[in-house]
Amino acid sequence: MSRLGALGGARAGLGLLLGTAAGLGFLCLLYSQRWKRTQRHGRSQSLPNSLGYTQTSDPGRQVMLLRAVPGGAGDASVLPSLPREGQEKVLDRLDFVLTSLVALRREVEELRSSLRGLAGEIVGEVRSHMEENQRVARRRRFPFVRERSDSTGSSSVYFTASSGATFTDAESEGGYTTANAESDNERDSDKESEDGEDEVSCETVKMGRKDSLDLEEEAASGASSALEAGGSSGLEDVLPLLQQADELHRGDEQGKREGFQLLLNNKLVYGSRQDFLWRLARAYSDMCELTEEVSEKKSYALDGKEEAEAALEKGDESADCHLWYAVLCGQLAEHESIQRRIQSGFSFKEHVDKAIALQPENPMAYFLLGRWCYQVSHLSWLEKKTATALLESPLSATVEDALQSFLKAEELQPGFSKAGRVYISKCYRELGKNSEARWWMKLALELPDVTKEDLALQKDLEELEVILRD
C-alpha cells in the first residue's frame, strides 16, 4: 500500500509539471505571435501627421486610420475605429476643408495686397485733389501773380473774359502801368535765366527765387508808398482805373467779370487805397451774384467781405465802404447757420444806417434798408425769439417801415429798381391798399429785368396780377 501511495504521488507531481510546462509553452506561443504582428504593423505604419492620422501600406487603396490625439496617458489608446468607408468620407471632407482653407488664405492675401494698392491710390488722389484746391485758392487770392495768358484763356469763373474786350497795359484808358506788366517781365527774365542755368544747384535756385520775391515785395511797397505820398498825382494815376471799373460794373455780365479781373490785376499796386478796396469788394459781390456754384458763392462773399473790412480799416467815413460791407454780409449770411444769419442781419442794418447817414441821397441804401425791414417784419415767432436771445437789442421793423424806405429810394431815383416797385406793391397790398398796390404793380411791369432779384420776384409779380386783377 505504501508503494502504491508513493507511485500515485509521483504521477501527480509529474502531471502537475507537464501541465505547467504546457501552459508556459502556450503563453510563449501567444506572446511570439503578438510580437510578430506588432512588428509587421510597425513596419507598415507611417509617422502621424499634423491631424493625428496615419496611412496604411495597402497597395490597392490608401486608407487613413484615425488615431487618438496624444494625451497625458501616452499614445497607447486608440479611438474606436470607424468602418473603412466612413473613414474615407471623413478624411475626404477633411481634405476638402484643408484645400478650401488654403485657397481662402490665398484669396485673403490677394485681397489684402489689392486693398493696400487701392488705399495708396485713394490717398494719392485725395492728396492731389487737395493740392489742386490749394492752387486754385491761391490763384483766386493772388491772381496778379498769374501770367497774362492765364487770365484771358482760363475757363475758371474767376477769370472769364472775352478776348476782344481784354484790357492790356497798352490799351488802358489812362495809360497807367499795372503790376502785371512788371511781374510778366520779371517772370520772362526768370525763365530765360533758368533755361540758361540748368547746371545750377537746387539751393542756388531757391535762393534766387527768394530774392526775386523779396524784390517784388519791395517794389510793391515802394509803389504803395509813392501813391500815398503822391497825393493828387496818385489820384490822377488811379482815377482812370476807378472810372473804368465803375463803367464795367454798370454793364452786363461780361463787363462785370472783366471789371473783377481788372481790379484783381491791379491790387498789388493800388491795394492800399480805400477807394480801390471797396470797388474790389463790390466786384466780389458781383461775382457772387453771377456764379451758380454754392461753394463759389460763399467763397466770393467771404473774400469780398474781407476786402470791405480792409477798406473800413482805412477810414470809417466812406458810405460806399459801409454799403458794400452790408451787401456782402447779407450774401454771406445765405450760407450760414440761423445764429450767424441773425448776427449778420444786425451788422447789415448797422452799416446800412451808417451809409445813409454819410450819403443820404443814395437810393440803393434806402432800397437795402427797405428790404431788410420787410424781411424782419415777416420773421416767424421762433426767429424773433432767437434774435432776442442772441442780441442785446431785438430786431424790430414793420411793413410800413419797409414801404417808406422803398418809396424814398423811388423818390431819389424813379425806376431805380424793378424789385423795389414789386416790394412797394406787396407792402400796399399787405396794408390793405389795393388800389395803390395795383398802381405800383403796373409800374413794375414797365421795367425790364436787370438783376437776378428782379427775375426772382417775377413769380410774386404774377401772383399780384392775379390777386389785384380789376
Swiss-Prot record:
Broad class of where this protein is predominantly found: mitochondrion
Disulfide linkage: none
SUPFAM superfamilies on file: TPR-like
Disordered: annotated segments: 167-231
Record motif FFAT, residues: 157-163
Residue numbers bearing the Phosphoserine modification: 44, 46, 50, 57, 183, 193, 212, 232
Signal peptide region: none
Ranges of biased composition (kind: Low complexity): 220-231
UniProt-recorded Gene Ontology molecular function terms: microtubule binding
Segments traversing the membrane: 13-35
GO cellular component, one term: nucleus
Coiled-coil ranges from the UniProt annotation: 92-124
Membrane association type: Single-pass membrane protein
Subcellular localization(s) per the UniProt record: Mitochondrion outer membrane; Cytoplasm; Nucleus; Cytoplasm, Cytoskeleton, Spindle
Protein function: Involved in cellular calcium homeostasis regulation. May participate in differentiation and apoptosis of keratinocytes. Overexpression induces apoptosis.
Stated family: Belongs to the RMDN family.
This protein's domain notes: The transmembrane region is required for mitochondrial localization. The FFAT motif is required for interaction with MOSPD2. The FFAT motif is involved in the interaction with VAPA and VAPB and its phosphorylation regulates these interactions.
Record text on subunit structure and interactions: Interacts with PTPN2. Interacts with microtubules. Interacts with VAPB. Interacts (via FFAT motif) with MOSPD2 (via MSP domain). Interacts (via phosphorylated FFAT motif) with MOSPD2, VAPA and VAPB.
Name under which the protein is recorded: Regulator of microtubule dynamics protein 3
